[in-house]
């Protein structure tokens, strides 16, 4: 079974590896994908939040930036919409991206990229991975 959102996340990780400032801390959430009921209950008991965005970036201004990755045509679940509204209300950054380019556009105002980083190369990864 193909997982387009997982593939997008892997491509984005590769793209960001050489472009983010070294002091930026970022991580992926444990959400996403199908889980058997036992695993889902276990993860929830450990604090995994249904609807949490896929990626979190700790920014130099004390705020966080969050990105929900979606396959082309993918839509937000009600839980994802609820978490997004809460994050925005708490004055954090949040966005949904269907491509590397959209993720980069969301992240530009966050001041996370190295000076001079080439952000116009998203196709390089998409083409080499195709």
Model regions and ranges:
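Catalytic phosphate/metal-binding cores of nucleic-acid and nucleotide-processing enzymes, i.e., regions
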Residues: 1-130
């Amino acid at each position: 079974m193909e997982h387009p959102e997982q593939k997008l996340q892997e491509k984005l990780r590769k793209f960001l590896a050489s472009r983010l400032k070294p002091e930026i801390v970022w991580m992926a959430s444990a959400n996403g994908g199908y889980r058997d009921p036992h695993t889902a209950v276990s993860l929830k008991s450990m604090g995994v939040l249904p609807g949490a965005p896929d990626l979190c970036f700790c920014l130099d201004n004390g705020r966080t930036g969050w990105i929900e990755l979606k396959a082309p045509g993918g839509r937000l679940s009600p839980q994802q919409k609820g978490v997004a509204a809460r994050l925005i209300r708490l004055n954090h950054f949040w966005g949904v991206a269907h491509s590397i380019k959209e993720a980069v556009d969301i992240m530009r105002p966050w001041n996370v990229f190295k000076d001079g980083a080439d952000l116009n190369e998203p196709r390089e990864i998409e083409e080499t991975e195709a």
